[in-house]
């Protein structure tokens, strides 16, 4: 814990093409070894593929997909009297977005298509239709929270 008070959170700049902070966060998450140019190309190419396949605006599909992936509840382990309980808690908006992007990329990387841009486009299209591995991860998280609803009174 810092002794000099709260550390200011650094804000990301919106990306140049879509003017969206969420797209910038997606690009930052795709990026490996500091290669932002490669990450941007993957992201923008995936958005182009989405536009071709769906015939809709890529940003609309992306926003729908993100809303379908972002979790509302999650469980957190809480130790009380020697027993560890999985306590359901609401997810803060910032964390919802981060988890959504993380789950989407994990699911995209596990897919079978040849290139990352095709995998990402496929996962985003699936997520916008409420299918795919990332949406399943969200449903599993919600089921876990629902199953442990009895321990909700142990919330932090």
Swiss-Prot record:
Protein keywords: Ribonucleoprotein, Ribosomal protein, RNA-binding, rRNA-binding, tRNA-binding
Highest taxon listed in the record's lineage: Bacteria
GO biological process: translation
Transmembrane helix listed as a keyword: no
One GO molecular-function entry: rRNA binding
One GO CC term, this protein: small ribosomal subunit
Entries under PANTHER family matching the protein: RIBOSOMAL PROTEIN S7 (PTHR11205)
Purpose: One of the primary rRNA binding proteins, it binds directly to 16S rRNA where it nucleates assembly of the head domain of the 30S subunit. Is located at the subunit interface close to the decoding center, probably blocks exit of the E-site tRNA.
Assembly mode: Part of the 30S ribosomal subunit. Contacts proteins S9 and S11.
Family per similarity comment: Belongs to the universal ribosomal protein uS7 family.
Protein name (record): Small ribosomal subunit protein uS7
Organism: Clostridium botulinum (strain Okra / Type B1)
């Amino acid at each position: 814990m810092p002794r000099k008070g709260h550390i200011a959170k650094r804000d990301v700049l919106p990306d140049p093409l879509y003017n969206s902070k969420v797209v910038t966060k997606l690009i930052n998450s795709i990026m490996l070894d500091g290669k932002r140019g490669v990450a941007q190309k993957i992201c923008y190419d995936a958005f182009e593929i989405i536009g071709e396949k769906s015939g809709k605006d890529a940003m609309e599909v992306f926003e729908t997909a993100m809303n379908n992936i972002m979790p509302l509840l999650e469980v957190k382990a809480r130790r009380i009297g020697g027993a560890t309980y999985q306590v359901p808690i609401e997810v803060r908006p910032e964390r919802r977005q981060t988890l959504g992007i993380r789950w989407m990329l994990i699911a995209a990387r596990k897919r079978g298509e040849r290139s990352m841009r095709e995998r990402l486009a496929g996962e985003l299209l699936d997520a916008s239709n409420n299918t795919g591995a990332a949406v399943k991860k969200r449903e599993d998280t919600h089921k876990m929270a629902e199953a442990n609803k009895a321990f909700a009174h142990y919330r932090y």
